[in-house]
Structure formats: C-alpha cells, structure tokens
C-alpha cells in the first residue's frame, strides 16, 4: 500500500504528519510539491516528532509542477500509489484528477476546484468541472473523494448523520465556522492568503426557497452562542459545500456562516477598497506587471509561521433544524480544535489541523474498503458511520448539542 501526497503547504504539513501516524494502513508515503525543500522540511518535522508509526515504510520527497498533467502522470506511474491525496491549492484539482484518470489511480482532495468569486466559478456551478469525471472514474474502476476537509467535508458528514439518524425532514442547514484563537498578529490569514482573501470577498450565495440567492459579502449576519467559545457574529458567505449539500440533502434553506472580528473586517474592507485584494494584473510605472493580491500575499505572514504562538479554540459545526417523529427539532453537531494541542501533535495550527485530520480519516475509509466504490463522490453521499467512528482517534472529536427549535435572527448589515 502507498499514497502520493501533492502539496506541502499548511494543509499538506498536517496531512503528511497524520499519514505518517497511520502508515501501518496507508503504507509508503511520497510527498511532492513544486518546492522539494518544503517536502523535506515536513519529513524532518515528522521524524523529529517521532510521528512515523512504522519505520520500515518509505517516506520520500519528490518535485512536481501540479499544473503540468504530463509531469503528474509520469510521477504517479513512477510512485505507483493506491491513492493520490491532493493537498494543494484548489486550482490544481482538475489537473490532478485528469492525471489520476490517465494513470488509473484513485483521488482525494479537500476543497472545490474554483474560487467561488469569478464568473462561471460560483456556487451553482462549483463542482461542475469535477463532477464531469463521474463516468470516467466509474468506468476506470477508480474512486474520487471530493472536499474531504472540515468545511467542506466533515460538516457535510454531520449533515448526512443528521439526515440518517436525527431527522425525518430537514428544513434548514446552517454551517457555522469560527476561530476563537489568537495568533498575536494584527492581520494574517490562517491558510493560503490568495485562496482565503478571494474566497471571502465574493458575494454570498445561498440556497433558499428553491432558488439560489445572492447578497454582497458581510451583509447578512447572525449571532450564535458557540459551546466553550461564547457568542460570535458570523457572516453569510459563499462556500463549497452549499452546492453539494443542495444536491444530496434537500432542505428549504442552506447557508454558510463564518466569524470575523471587527478588526479583521476593518483591515479587509480597507484593503479591498484601495484595490489590494484584486487578482487582476496591474502595470507599474517601470513596466513591471503585478497582481495586487499576490503582492499582499508576499507581505503577509506565512500561515505556517503562526503555529508556535497560537492559542485558543476553533469551533465548526452544522446546525440542522427540521422534524423528528412529527416534532420540531434543532441540533448543532460540532467539533472543537485547540491550537496548542495541534501544535504539540504536528507542529501546526488548528485551522490546517481541521483540514488535514479529515483528509486522512477519509483516506483510511478508502483503504479499508468503506469508501472505495468506483466513481466520484462528495462526502454527503458516503456512509457517515465509519468516518465519524474513526475521526476522534485521528485527532478530532465531535458532539451533538440539542437547541430550542426556531430560525435564527438574521440581520442585514449595511
């Protein structure tokens, strides 16, 4: 058995550590990235933490350009993995899926392939490019597990669990995500700044009363009392799992909410207003062409560097309301992750941890034959039971909290 991991950023760091801790099942591990030095740094950390469970298994680094399908196919054929785990940025998903199809090897990723902001890449068409592989993968006898992070990913498994055990009829699904931790910086992103800052500046698109609705970012807000973290303002925004939840778990309203502090929003709004968040090319006086968002990315702290001093909790969950046995019911299925615990385990912060742990939990379901049917699948389509039974032992627990039924007080912010 063996895996090929592509990507050596923050998520890739955690994925590699967790794969190493479970290499008795996953087998040999090859980590590949455009920068082989990043792969080697991860390997050094794994060995330094004694996280390689079976020292007889291989742990190697390779160089690859994840945009180059021919190079990817060549690497896959050389490594001969049973599963390719894509821990790279979203825009390489389709190239890696095509390479896996050509090499006839199964595939897993942690997010949708588009930015959710650009025309033709928004929530209603979010998975079109990857769902186009369904027949190809099925005919080739290989599996693709899409968006196996936390959100997207585990939150969809929570919804599937709710539909299977807790509800006869679902009215609303609200995915809620806050980071109650503190990294000590005035402004920083917890994962790739380019991906993060594109994601949160687009219009919010959500499903309501049989249609997609759209509002400007940060203009729909509610307050929610998170267990162990307290009350937080969360804002409606576009997110990957809205499309797949709408496809596989019918509900009257499906919406994603993320917590932002006032200071963060002040910085964000200022940078957006002066054009620093633009991904479009800009020509300087000397003729140099730059993209403001990429310049900003180069100036911001590397998300990996935030880990050593990070303190506090994250809380991410799925708030489901509907009926069970004819009675109204409201439940919040959630997880807490602790930044300090994550750093002690894998030398990284909890944001990356909550993506990397589910990816390896899903990979284990593939290797154990639980999630290995040929075809292309989102997490909602798969049996939630073995995944939720396994995830606590990989590093993330989960709980169910009963709430008083009643729709949230959603406020319009101008």
From Swiss-Prot:
Disruption phenotype: Deletion of the gene abolishes norspermidine and spermidine biosynthesis, and results in increased accumulation of diaminopropane. Deletion leads to a reduction in growth rate of planktonic cells and severely reduced biofilm formation. Gene3D superfamilies: Dihydrodipicolinate Reductase, domain 2 (3.30.360.10), NAD(P)-binding Rossmann-like Domain (3.40.50.720). It catalyses: carboxynorspermidine + NADP(+) + H2O = L-aspartate 4-semialdehyde + propane-1,3-diamine + NADPH + H(+); carboxyspermidine + NADP(+) + H2O = L-aspartate 4-semialdehyde + putrescine + NADPH + H(+). GO terms for biological process: polyamine biosynthetic process. Disulfide bonds: none annotated. Keywords: NADP, Oxidoreductase, Polyamine biosynthesis. The keyword Oxidoreductase applies. It is an enzyme of class 1 (oxidoreductase). One of its GO terms (molecular function) is carboxynorspermidine dehydrogenase activity. Its EC number is 1.5.1.43. InterPro entries: CANSDH, NAD(P)-bd_dom_sf, Sacchrp_dh-like_C, Sacchrp_dh_NADP-bd. Involved in norspermidine biosynthesis. Catalyzes the synthesis of carboxynorspermidine from L-aspartate 4-semialdehyde and 1,3-diaminopropane. Is also active with putrescine as a substrate. Essential for biofilm formation. Belongs to the saccharopine dehydrogenase family. Carboxynorspermidine synthase subfamily. PANTHER family: CARBOXYNORSPERMIDINE SYNTHASE. This is Carboxynorspermidine synthase. It comes from Vibrio cholerae serotype O1 (strain ATCC 39315 / El Tor Inaba N16961).
